[in-house]
Amino acid sequence: MSGGASATGPRRGPPGLEDTTSKKKQKDRANQESKDGDPRKETGSRYVAQAGLEPLASGDPSASASHAAGITGSRHRTRLFFPSSSGSASTPQEEQTKEGACEDPHDLLATPTPELLLDWRQSAEEVIVKLRVGVGPLQLEDVDAAFTDTDCVVRFAGGQQWGGVFYAEIKSSCAKVQTRKGSLLHLTLPKKVPMLTWPSLLVEADEQLCIPPLNSQTCLLGSEENLAPLAGEKAVPPGNDPVSPAMVRSRNPGKDDCAKEEMAVAADAATLVDEPESMVNLAFVKNDSYEKGPDSVVVHVYVKEICRDTSRVLFREQDFTLIFQTRDGNFLRLHPGCGPHTTFRWQVKLRNLIEPEQCTFCFTASRIDICLRKRQSQRWGGLEAPAARVGGAKVAVPTGPTPLDSTPPGGAPHPLTGQEEARAVEKDKSKARSEDTGLDSVATRTPMEHVTPKPETHLASPKPTCMVPPMPHSPVSGDSVEEEEEEEKKVCLPGFTGLVNLGNTCFMNSVIQSLSNTRELRDFFHDRSFEAEINYNNPLGTGGRLAIGFAVLLRALWKGTHHAFQPSKLKAIVASKASQFTGYAQHDAQEFMAFLLDGLHEDLNRIQNKPYTETVDSDGRPDEVVAEEAWQRHKMRNDSFIVDLFQGQYKSKLVCPVCAKVSITFDPFLYLPVPLPQKQKVLPVFYFAREPHSKPIKFLVSVSKENSTASEVLDSLSQSVHVKPENLRLAEVIKNRFHRVFLPSHSLDTVSPSDTLLCFELLSSELAKERVVVLEVQQRPQVPSVPISKCAACQRKQQSEDEKLKRCTRCYRVGYCNQLCQKTHWPDHKGLCRPENIGYPFLVSVPASRLTYARLAQLLEGYARYSVSVFQPPFQPGRMALESQSPGCTTLLSTGSLEAGDSERDPIQPPELQLVTPMAEGDTGLPRVWAAPDRGPVPSTSGISSEMLASGPIEVGSLPAGERVSRPEAAVPGYQHPSEAMNAHTPQFFIYKIDSSNREQRLEDKGDTPLELGDDCSLALVWRNNERLQEFVLVASKELECAEDPGSAGEAARAGHFTLDQCLNLFTRPEVLAPEEAWYCPQCKQHREASKQLLLWRLPNVLIVQLKRFSFRSFIWRDKINDLVEFPVRNLDLSKFCIGQKEEQLPSYDLYAVINHYGGMIGGHYTACARLPNDRSSQRSDVGWRLFDDSTVTTVDESQVVTRYAYVLFYRRRNSPVERPPRAGHSEHHPDLGPAAEAAASQASRIWQELEAEEEPVPEGSGPLGPWGPQDWVGPLPRGPTTPDEGCLRYFVLGTVAALVALVLNVFYPLVSQSRWR
């Protein structure tokens, strides 16, 4: 590797080449210093110290000779390491070095010693240096290492030492020193700037003079080398080229002219670029790409409001660079310190070569479209190069930058397949070999490809990076070559490996990804602790095959060596045990999860021989004792790490409806299947307080569309108005009268949101200390507002004064010529013969001892004013009270002339008739009453029209004596106060009592004597609107005056939204068992439909909650609930649902994984969102939220985790660690293994080797397959839906087609076949 080459010092080229290069560099440096100023003056003593450093390279006699000759200014001296010969006498300078641990390595002098630096390599976050010291074993006590952020010095007991100045800064406080077998010393150096690629381990002396210190904001993720300085970057002077020494070492002396020509071209290209005010390098921009045919690749870059005048795309053979400015506020907020004038740059190193001249781009309103023309017609399988070799070390970076923005499922670029990845790696290897051999193979490349990227110095603000800690490796026996190979194979960050869809296996992929982010389960399987607990003799298990297969798959997901991994082995193991998972049909993710965890439990069950146990009832014993006995009985048969981590316990309570026998048992659970509230409907309910002075309040109450009861409304209103539900009455009003009064158990399924519901607060007998009379009250006018212009029976219009129409005296709404017409029309009219009501009816509750006429009238008038408008017109002197009938009024016809047969056939006789005033031309026949128009609400009583005040004669029947007025009084406009109305001699209304036989009787005012009213009667409030009376009132219905409840404003929006608390409440609510689930009562000796209630008793460390979104009514009627269920991401408190023994700390949980389901019952797609919690705190994450969409893995924000598609939730309990079993050998854990078990153990060992060897490249073309299996898929990978809604539409169409086909097969086909046989 080049790291080792660097350790031996620079290889000298021919003297002529060195002199020419040195002169050219000195000349360019002089020009640069005259333009920008001397960098030594700017940085002060730092450069002075570097200039005075004179280390000697080991094994380089020329360097030693140069030092002896006093040549101190040579530009080819390299600060690499500082070894000193062992066994030589210590000089005073060396003694001073041994005393000071942090001495500046710049001032050390070295003598030639054997080579110490063996190799070095780097990952995304750290650099590992390997030193070989001697032959014998090496102890940490013999090593003295001193680190700073820029350099290090390592001394050994034998007198050797090594050190130097690093290419970039490190975290000196986190540096580690470890010893390995074979006298190896490993130095682990965490990078201060993660994801920054180091071209070399140590820096050259001349580089320190021209490269400024690394900025902590320099976080470049992507290509390892910038092949040309672009607009916005400071051009690197040719003399300061950091790779120039390395290039000189690798060149062939015969190719010097070509090399100098390349450097000259690079310098000329660099000086042509002007430096702008600011330039920000972007590690990632939201994008996607796809291959358009065999010759093109289309890239969509999603940036809005781009300034087209200053934006452009630069193309080269192996990369392209987007330079742009944007005014998009959302984009600028992601980059603090940046504004509309900030220039951004995003460079992408491509997977294969392109034709720059044939590439195009265009700007749209919301994105940039880039079309890349391939140099060769071949399938890329991805956009960016997966990895590259820089400085001799293979850099482990993702195929593409880790996205910082969320993308919908299927919106990310396709990953690189394994075969293409292998070809790319071989291409990199051959390219590296060609560069080492000479310039012949390099001459075809562009000159700028040899320029190593210079660290950015003009970053406006720190950019976010993906800080992914590597997965801890277990100690490996033997050499560390295997570990080094895995590091070199890394192509993505740990935890960003997807799973290939083998064919409708998205349900399996989502479950595996969620379980792989369960911290305790991941660590348990990764460090192979589970091997000590494999139960090889369990007939219910797989002999350890499932556990080992799951461990291999889990390790592959966290090694970062695959973009996507095929879970085919695990699927085959599962299918061998459960035949329903054979093939490529769709399955329920929760069903697969339950089987997988149960299979892992059986493979890891610590119980070798399961004893027989029985379920024991409580029999009146304390719950604590019964629960502990049940748990220990369960652990006698089931004891594994899966039980310790996932299983809890709930209390089941059954009550017999006949004998009231109570049975209490305690059962374990692996997950909680919580039901979802049914679809909601919002009902408007008007609440009337007990006292009429409080204005009614309109509430919006959400109830279930099916199986809802009045108790739901009463309970909701009870919480809002703080009144007990038993003191509330709910009634439905239709056409101004009570349609029905609901009991709490009555159903509301037939009530629609357009119906009118009234809720009344009633006085309780406990509060009144006596009997309370509850009365229904309805309102109606004395004279209805129905026009009468013709006979209702013969339809003959009134012709003359002598032929007057007569009204029906019961309803006053129809008229007849005579009694014969009335008798003819009576069968049709009797169902509608009732008075016309106005306003809203209401309920009043009065203590029996205070039920006086004055109190009753006050309550009635107080409630009535909210739904009717009342106006008393001014008094007219010419109007007098009617003492007798009008002279022109005809005598009432008697009903005695009806035939007896008719009376027997119809016990309800037609009422008497009353004359109607003749209708004039154009007269409506209406009494002069303020009638409410049908087209809108009635105006307020403050404005009275002249039509309302007009009066006209009307013929009426004889009036009761109580209705006569003794003297005229001046009328008071507007509504009168109840006290005034009571004191007035003429009331505005009359009160009638209606008994159970529907007979009416007017109530008389008895002063302070209470009225005797039974519970079976109701009241009618009759308004005096007869214009023939001296003091009449104008009355009409109006819209109910009420106040809006502010808390109900968002009830309509929340109708389709539920909370997890509501679901848990439904889970713990008692329910009646269905007939097919009847419980056998041991006391009745019969099956009973008992009531059952489940309550949580013992909570697990990892709580899995399934939202029961699927409902199966029949084969055809199946449904999925897609309503949003709001669940907490942080701090789920289950203390109110757990009735077990209370602990000191509340049972709080944090979400770490979600399985989502898109689509319907027939077709759908599963994805998963997950994060890796910290091992000590579930609130923190070692790896943030990611979206797993089969083989595509992208980062998402935590705010996007809660969606309406969530199906299975994974919660981790706070401050409740699960102790893992100690790792032990199989013989120690199972000392009595028989030959069969030993054979199974040997087979398990072979499984390890077989499954680990299965980590082969993903075959090209694998992906979401059809139901015919992987071998039947040909062609490129199909792209998933861009957004979840698009996927839902696709699955909805497919589901509809499948439902129609099923309907035809089940309904029409049998009919056709039957008719054919007939």
UniProtKB/Swiss-Prot annotation:
Class of enzymatic activity (EC top level)? hydrolase
According to the record, the segments passing through the membrane are 1292-1312
Per the record, what ranges lie on the membrane's Cytoplasmic side? 1-1291
Q: What is known of its domains?
A: Contains two CS (CHORD and Sgt1) domains, namely CS1 and CS2, in its N-terminus and a catalytic USP domain (USPD).
Which controlled-vocabulary keywords does the entry list? Endoplasmic reticulum, Hydrolase, Membrane, Metal-binding, Phosphoprotein, Protease, Repeat, Thiol protease, Transmembrane, Transmembrane helix, Ubl conjugation pathway, Zinc, Zinc-finger
Start-end of MYND-type zinc fingers: 791-833
The active site of this protein is located at 506 (nucleophile), 1165 (proton acceptor)
- Keyword Acetylation annotated: no
Phylogenetic lineage:
Eukaryota, Metazoa, Chordata, Craniata, Vertebrata
Which residue ranges are assigned to the Lumenal compartment in the record's topology? Answer: 1313-1318
Tell me the GO molecular function terms.
cysteine-type deubiquitinase activity; Hsp90 protein binding; zinc ion binding
Binding-site positions, Zn(2+) 1: 791, 794, 817, 821
Functionally, this protein is described as follows: Deubiquitinating enzyme that regulates the degradation of various proteins by removing ubiquitin moieties, thereby preventing their proteasomal degradation. Stabilizes RNF123, which promotes CDKN1B degradation and contributes to cell proliferation. Decreases the levels of ubiquitinated proteins during skeletal muscle formation and acts to repress myogenesis. Modulates transcription of major myofibrillar proteins. Also involved in turnover of endoplasmic-reticulum-associated degradation (ERAD) substrates.
What species was this sequence derived from? Answer: Homo sapiens
Q: What is this protein called?
A: Ubiquitin carboxyl-terminal hydrolase 19
Q: Which topology term describes how it sits in the membrane?
A: Single-pass membrane protein
Q: Where is this region: Disordered?
A: 1-109, 234-255, 390-479, 1218-1239
Q: Where does Zn(2+) 2 bind?
A: 808, 811, 829, 833
